[in-house]
Amino acid sequence: MGYTHYWTQTRDFTPQEMNKINGELLDIVKVSGIPLGGWDGTGSPEFTTETIGFNGKGDDDGHETFRINATRKLPFEGASPDRLGWAFCKTAAKPYDIVVVACLTVLAAKHGFDVSSDGGAKDWEDGVKLASKALGEIFTNPMRREEAA
């Protein structure tokens, strides 16, 4: 299954801003109760002032890594400069997908990320609810804005 989320990080972040983002996204991880691993599904998720990265835990529940960096990067060597900060994560709708969706909801609402997805607003509802519960704020479903456009 190729269920994928896409985003563009519109600016670089300072270490202080990354610490704030780390706190927000770690709250989501804790409230979710979903086991997460490092980039390859083993070990621990990475939450530093340079990088945030995680995957589902193990071979069955992991798929592709969700990663953001303090400094925007091109998605691949030779990519057009207008792709600076663009990335994606194919979750295949595995259990960690709800955490990815919740994180992208917060990043879009509070940190200027542009997000899109193979899924629609209904597919994002549980992730948006998780973000709201974890941070104690009401978040708008970013896919509702995309569908209205």
Regions found by a protein language model. Name each.
Residues 1-149:
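Acidic (Asp/Glu-rich) sequence patches and key acidic residues
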